[in-house]
From Swiss-Prot:
GO molecular function: 2 iron, 2 sulfur cluster binding; 4 iron, 4 sulfur cluster binding; biotin synthase activity; iron ion binding
Stated family: Belongs to the radical SAM superfamily. Biotin synthase family.
Cofactor: [4Fe-4S] cluster; [2Fe-2S] cluster
Upper lineage: Bacteria, Pseudomonadati, Thermodesulfobacteriota, Desulfovibrionia, Desulfovibrionales
Gene assigned in the entry: bioB
Record's protein name: Biotin synthase
Catalytic class of the enzyme: transferase
Chain positions recorded as [4Fe-4S] cluster binding sites: C67, C71, C74
Length: 324
């Protein structure tokens, strides 16, 4: 059955609680190529009507490498010889120093990210101490991505003043076993649930281009919707030498932009943040992310790969009229 993106757009525009279903999302994803630009234009209208203001997010790789998980895309997995940087947990002072530099660069949000399945008690204390100091010394909204949480850990982070917890599902449940076999999909959903129950905003997304089907992209977006994500980060695979996906072909740029647009149809009011891989996949179309429905951008470096110049990103956003 065909679908008219403009009709669906009007329905969502008229009702802030309306959104595309998984079935509608798949039909949008399977529209012929000549419908891509009208689809993107509709996503832009939905973003303008329902999403929050544009924002930027920056991260620090607080503990790098030696992760016991075997995620097939990840440079930090101990299962693969990738040559990625390895270092133990940064101390509180170093985390605050990174935050100060990124605040000066203009970031709105700051994420503390660690490799590994879950944080050790002392690492959790370090993050909590850093969050307190970052809130006292900067305008940044502090976030953390530390792996799986316990109820006690989630409560500690919230008490310290953390605003948002990031935990990706990575891909659809039906494709997850092709990506990771060292933990179960439901463990990730449980961590997202614990973060929300602790009073934290939830940042939950995934990676496109792992070999999943369009139907599985719609499935992932539907699961994120059921997790009630406040922010949806969209990463685009950058193949890493030494990982099982090192020879994966990149998504075509307009396939990636079309998927971002469809995510906006499914998440009209959520923040949609385009993060890792945009330089590799989108190339000259990297400025199209906001036109395609996103309202957030990760700036600066990623976990193990260099990002675009922060100054260049802010210049691009100002020229687009997204930021002043």
């Amino acid at each position: 059955m065909t679908i008219n993106p403009d009709d669906l757009c009007r329905r969502i525009m008229a009702d802030p609680e309306a959104c595309a279903t998984e079935d509608e999302a798949l039909r949008l994803l399977e529209l012929p190529a000549e419908q891509t630009l009208p689809l993107i234009a509709c996503a832009q209208r939905i973003r303008t009507a329902h999403a929050g203001p544009a924002f930027t997010c920056a991260i620090v790789n607080a503990r790098s490498g030696r992760c016991p998980e075997n995620c097939s895309f990840c440079a930090q997995s101990a299962h693969y010889a990738t040559g990625a940087p390895e270092h133990p947990m940064l101390n509180t002072a170093a985390l605050v120093e990174h935050a100060l530099k990124l605040a000066d660069a203009g970031a709105d949000r700051f994420g503390i990210v660690t490799s590994g399945t879950r944080p050790a008690p002392r690492e959790l204390e370090t993050v909590c101490e850093a969050v307190v100091r970052i809130r006292a010394r900067t305008h940044l909204s502090p976030c953390a991505s530390l792996g799986q949480l316990s109820p006690q850990a989630a409560a500690m982070l919230r008490q310290a003043g953390l605003e948002r917890y990031h935990h990706n599902l990575e891909t659809a449940r039906s494709f997850f076993a092709s990506v990771c076999t060292t933990h179960d999909y439901d463990e990730d959903i449980y961590t997202v649930k614990l973060a929300r129950e602790a009073g934290l905003a939830v940042c939950c997304g995934g990676i496109l281009g792992l070999g999943e089907s369009r139907a599985q992209r719609a499935e992932l977006s539907g699961q994120i919707k059921r997790c009630r994500a406040d922010s949806v980060p969209v990463n685009l695979l950058t193949p890493v030498a030494g990982t099982p996906l090192e020879r994966m072909d990149p998504l075509p740029p307009f396939e990636a932009l079309r998927t971002i647009a469809v995510f906006r149809f499914m998440h009209p009011q959520a923040d949609i943040l385009v993060a890792g891989g945009r330089e590799h996949v989108l190339g000259e179309y990297r400025s199209w992310t906001f036109i395609s429905g996103a309202n957030g951008l990760m700036v600066g470096n990623y976990l193990t790969t260099a990002g675009r110049s922060t100054a260049d990103d802010y210049t691009m956003l100002r020229h687009m009229g997204v930021l002043r």
